[in-house]
């Protein structure tokens, strides 16, 4: 990761020369994949948590559903954080240096991907700081749904 990558990620447009410099393409690609896998894991966990409570026939009250939503989302986000580097490794080992550089270079200019990654980091941070783990899960879930809607519902 470099200062140029962070500047682009934060929304400050670097020069063309700075955009050409990709000193750590594996790390840049890994961050992108890990953010996406955490978002996906949190959303799937948030859906499966209440469903598992419903299937288990335990005492079904509102607080139990909220707790299962949060714990499912947290577990999904943790699994996504673990799977992100694994998925990155599996993808990168099949790429040569030029194709990896090309992928990172394209990600730097892909406004939809940048918007989705920025939204995930920002909403997860705001959610965590405002409401703890519940806010983190809701932030990750909403960031995925909103960014998909903003990019034209291309699932």
Predicted regions and their residues:
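Membrane-interacting alpha-helical segments
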Residues: 90-155
């Amino acid at each position: 990761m470099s200062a140029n990558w962070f500047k682009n990620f934060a929304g400050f447009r670097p020069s063309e020369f700075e955009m050409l410099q990709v000193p750590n393409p594996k790390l840049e690609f890994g961050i992108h994949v890990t953010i996406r896998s955490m978002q996906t894991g949190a959303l799937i966990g948030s859906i499966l948590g209440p469903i598992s409570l419903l299937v288990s026939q335990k005492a079904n009250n509102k607080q139990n559903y909220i707790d299962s939503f949060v714990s499912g989302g947290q577990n999904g986000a943790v699994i996504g954080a673990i799977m992100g580097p694994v998925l990155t490794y599996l993808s990168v080992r099949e790429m040569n240096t030029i194709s990896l550089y090309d992928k990172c270079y394209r990600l730097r200019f892909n406004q939809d991907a940048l918007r989705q990654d920025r939204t995930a980091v920002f909403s997860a941070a705001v959610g965590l700081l405002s409401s703890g783990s519940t806010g983190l899960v809701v932030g990750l879930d909403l960031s995925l749904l909103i960014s998909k809607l903003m990019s034209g519902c291309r699932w």
